[in-house]
Amino acid sequence: VPVKKRPRKPEPETNLRHGGKMSGTCPRCHYGRNKKARGKLLHGIPEVTDSEQLREVLVRIDRNLRQDEALMQDETASFIMGVLEAKISGNEYFLVASSGRNANPWIQKKHLDGIPHHPGAWETVNPQVPERHTGWWTVRNENVDLDTSIRSVSNPCAAIKLLLGLGRKKPAWKSVEYLRMSEMVFVGRAADDPSKRQWHGKGATSSWTAHSCDACEARIPYLICDVPANEIVG
């Protein structure tokens, strides 16, 4: 009697994606995010994934935060922290942000000590997130308006601050070698925040990393579109 083999489980995705997949259609320019012209992708950032190195950066920041006695006194603290690394036209960017409308962000320069991945290169960004569907800008620092159907459009999420922060650096835009981003939840011991406690990543090595929320999934595709405005038809 032949031995029955157990069905093989599908391989889990190595990296979480933020803002959809490259197989989708861009809501800003309405081109396919994997569309090519003259053999080259129209979108320098067709999708945003995380990486093992970025998850290690978040682990270190989390450790630093939990050693901050002043912060830990607030046992109700809860926020999302995010990190982004990008190489655009030969220039590298290493950004850190935390969610929330705080004038002073949760993550400060002192919390960036000891990061093993590009030590000393990281900086925090805390741009003002637009309150309405208008007045936004892309990573290329070009103006963009979001669809009015997007709910919670003004949510000051870490991922959004990272992309807006990159745009405000006005990077020279010739080629994108990579742009990666990862998020993680910080929840204080007494925080009554079940919405954040439910975020658990499904990545092969990142069971603790956070998914983007629905509002970010809708907003990120607009912000990562780097197709020049003069090349958008209609």
Predicted segments with their positions:
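Catalytic cores of nucleic-acid editing and processing enzymes
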Residues: V1-G234
